[in-house]
UniProtKB/Swiss-Prot annotation:
One of its GO terms (cellular component) is cytoplasm. Belongs to the UvrC family. It holds the Pfam family UvrC_RNaseH_dom. It comes from the Bacteria. InterPro entries: GIY-YIG_endonuc, GIY-YIG_endonuc_sf, GIY-YIG_UvrC_Cho, RuvA_2-like, UVR_dom, UVR_dom_sf, UvrABC_protein_C, UvrC. Residues 19-96 form the GIY-YIG domain. The UvrABC repair system catalyzes the recognition and processing of DNA lesions. UvrC both incises the 5' and 3' sides of the lesion. The N-terminal half is responsible for the 3' incision and the C-terminal half is responsible for the 5' incision. NCBIfam families: uvrC. This is UvrABC system protein C. Interacts with UvrB in an incision complex.
Amino acid sequence: MAEITTREKLHEVALSAPKTSGVYLWKDKAGTVIYVGKAKSLKNRLSSYFTSNRDIKTRILVSRAESIEYIQTENEYEALLLENTLIKKHKPRYNINLKDGKTYPVLKLTNEEFPKVYRTRNIKNDGSKYFGPFPNVSAVDMFLTLIKHNYTLRQCKQLKKRETPCLYFHIGRCKAPCCGKISAEEYGKDIEEITLLLEGEMEDVSGTLKEKMKEAAEKKEFEKAARLRDGIQAVYALRGQNIVQDMDPESRDYIAWAFEGAMVSIAVLKMRNGRLVGRDLYRSHSLKEEGEILSEFISAYYTSANEVPPKIFIPQAAEGNALIEKWLNEELHAKTRISIIPLEKESLAAEERSAADSLTEIEEAASKTIGYAVKEPAPLSAQEEKLNLSPAEIKHHKAALKMARFNAKEDAMRRLREQGDFAAVEDLQKRLNLPCLPQRIEGFDIAHLGGTFTVAALISFKEGNPDKKNYRIFRLKNTDGVIDDYASMREVIARRYTRLLNEGADLPDLILIDGGIGQVNAASKIVDALDLGIPVIGLAEKNEEVYFPHNSKPVILPRRSDALRLLQRIRDEAHRFSNTRNNKLRRANKLKTEFENLPHIGKKRAHVLLKAFGSTENLKTLTAQALSETAKISLKQAEEVLDAVKTTNNNN
């Protein structure tokens, strides 16, 4: 008799569940809760996960689950309360987790004696001034370039007293407050002008900038004039985006969402006292159906009564609306009402609009009143009539919801472009008979030059595309100067996964090695010793053969298969990343040697000069006095160094 599969066991649990309301928990092999859901009928809901036409996000859950548990409740509202409690307790991987949320950037003017201005997405209660949020990141960057070239503010992360100024002072990009070369009062004059620009009081300041642009053009300094022109345009663009006002003083939120596979994008427009004060954009795993997403999101998004506005508007009816409104009022003690204002389905042309056009529409929306994009309203529907709002008010709220939905859909499309290769992930699992979908794959490659400058590259792919925030480079300690790829592989695998285990971090579903059976066996030895239970494979470049540990007979994948294409992408990316870092180390060593070969410059001074100026070529622009202060050598010695630099460059 064939052994029963995990899927069949889970299906039996679903079929035996009661038809009462309750909460269910999916767990993986380690007993970790990976998803929590609620149901009016536990049996009906759990059984629905095993129908043949389920979507990708459901197949992901079933492939990763090892067991199901459920808790019965007296009614659906109790199930909602219990679900919320369990989600906060277990923080399951496939429930909404707002830690990964994304918002539009703001500009931060720090609360310091010598402030700096920079872009951030994190707003803290630290006394700093914040301006924004700004949808157009390019305009923010152009504005910062304007600041950098015209106001010479400090650029260091922390202001520390120094004896000699940094490179930015010598090239005219900083006034060196760290060395006392400018007073706080004088520095503050630039800060006042920048603040006026950001607050919209810009006529005098922009006039000065336009005069500078005109002067630069007359002097044929066209690059400088172009920077000033772009900066002035950025200032006007940001002024349009900084606030959006309307005539309704009541506070409210507009929430819309868009699904893509197992991920959901949710946009929130926050209106307070007639002003758009924020646009929050969140991405998260969620296995909820579209009609259920609202209750899970709201219970995660709002955590106290003062965060909840009197009104929340959504674009479509959702399961559990009444329950979540009851939860807000009774559990958070917030007096609020959730209202539905249906939006017409967008045309195919609108949905396929390019990203550039989409961004333009967002900017236009942000620079006008929020009723920017709605045509003359059709007669009110029965649902709209129940809201007791005028046609003009309905039009107004529809425009805001349309803007929220547009943001969510654009984010979903952007994510699809970033990581949409799920077909290859499924094909890889099927062809290599892997135990679960390899959603997270980590690839390794070793690079060296005759055993020197040995580095190991770790690259990460998530759901079929690069996950660059998890890329890592390892300078190998035990094999530098020795050609031993197997020992190098053992070292990097041990360092990587010992750390992940100690931190309790998520492990990958598959490890890919750039190499053949020898490298695979070396990596597998460490994986087995750590008892990770992660499959290890290798891709040999010569014939594109896939190797498993302790099996010299390779698997040959079809040349045009999605699975092989994905493995090649990962292998090639790891190879590129390791070689790039290896070459960088070799160049840095060459440059350091060039500094060390200069008179009066030893290893320590070479390190200081390399960090400050980057190359000996850049020393030619310095005065002997500046070099003397930076390298801490006498003026005569500095002159000899500069003479040596000029002689060397002339010979080359």
